[in-house]
Structure formats: structure tokens, C-alpha cells
């Protein structure tokens, strides 16, 4: 409920209802029975307008209590498509240095993508996951292009392929990060 309900509400309000109101206003202003030429001209011009709606439709859970989104953010259907690994957003596709697609490497539980971190960073997560009995797969790719693409050195991916947490810095408290990501802590 915390994540998906607001996204469904946003989809209804910000896209479906908005499209219905836009169509209603258009048909009130341009009636083909009154002025067919004006209707056809505006109809043609209108066809290119949906692109912005397509680009802004990006369901995300950045306001979720189990994601490290920006303070004050909310779960919504409105967002922006980016390659950066952002908490609460779907992981972008990437061909790893091994030649495999990142999605082929994700585990059934959580996955930590390690893109070149100080020694021990990924191991801290592995040890914490084991102690907490949280399924965690480690994927390592030290290719600089991958790090630049995701704009992070560590990316914690949920089972639904959404990013729970990412960092370019210190790993932080791996146990607290995992506990929050599974909804068992603040």
C-alpha cells in the first residue's frame, strides 16, 4: 500500500484524468462539424504533444520508507528517466564488462552491485545479510564505465528490480541499510 497505491493514484490523476480533461477541452474548442479544417489542423498539431507525457511517466517509490530517496519525496507515477541508480527508481539496463546484461545477474532476493569500492565494502553487506538471514547476491563489475553509468559504486537492488539504496561513498552501516530495505527498521 505505501508504495503502489500512491503510484496508482498518481497514474489516475496525473495521466488518465488529465488526458480525459484535455480531450474534453479540445473537443469543446474544436468541433469538426463546425470547422473541420481547424479541427484537423489542431488534431495534427496535438499528436506530437504526448511525448512529454511519455517521458514524465516513470513510476517510482523514492518516498518509500524502505528506499533512500530524497528527503520529502513521495511515491508517484511522475518522474524522469535517468541511467543513474536512484533509490526508489527502477534499475536501468546495463551491459556489464562481462558482456552479460545486469538483469541476468540479479538474484531472486536482494542484489548488491559493487562497482569498485574500498576493500571490504561488499563483504560488509554479505556478512550483514547472512547475519540477518536476508538473501543477497553480490555482482561485481569494476569497469569505470559501469560506475559512471550508474553514478554509484554500490547499488542495492530489491527483488522487484527497483533500487533500494546507492552510494558513491562509504558503505555506511550495512546492517542498518539492509534492515531498512526489508522494512524491519527505520
State the predicted function of each range.
Residues 1-186:
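Helical substrate-recognition/capping region of FAD-dependent monooxygenase/halogenase enzymes
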Amino acid at each position: 500500500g505505501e508504495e503502489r497505491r500512491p503510484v496508482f493514484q498518481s497514474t489516475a490523476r496525473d495521466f488518465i484524468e488529465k488526458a480525459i480533461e484535455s480531450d474534453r477541452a479540445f473537443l469543446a474548442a474544436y468541433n469538426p462539424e463546425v470547422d473541420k479544417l481547424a479541427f484537423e489542423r489542431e488534431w495534427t498539431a496535438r499528436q506530437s504533444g504526448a511525448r512529454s507525457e511519455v517521458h514524465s511517466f516513470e513510476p517510482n517509490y523514492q518516498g518509500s520508507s524502505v528506499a533512500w530517496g530524497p528527503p520529502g519525496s513521495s511515491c508517484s507515477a511522475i518522474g524522469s528517466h535517468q541511467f543513474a541508480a536512484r533509490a526508489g527508481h527502477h534499475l536501468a539496463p546495463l551491459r556489464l564488462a562481462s558482456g552479460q546484461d545486469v538483469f541476468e545477474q540479479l538474484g531472486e532476493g536482494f542484489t548488491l552491485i559493487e562497482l569498485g569500492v574500498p576493500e571490504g565494502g561488499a563483504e560488509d553487506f554479505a556478512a550483514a545479510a547472512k547475519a540477518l538471514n536476508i538473501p543477497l547476491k553480490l555482482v561485481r563489475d569494476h569497469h569505470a564505465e559501469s560506475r559512471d553509468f550508474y553514478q554509484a559504486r554500490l547499488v542495492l537492488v530489491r527483488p522487484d528490480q527497483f533500487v533500494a539504496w546507492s552510494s558513491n561513498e562509504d558503505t555506511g552501516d550495512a546492517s542498518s541499510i539492509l534492515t531498512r530495505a526489508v522494512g524491519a527498521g527505520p
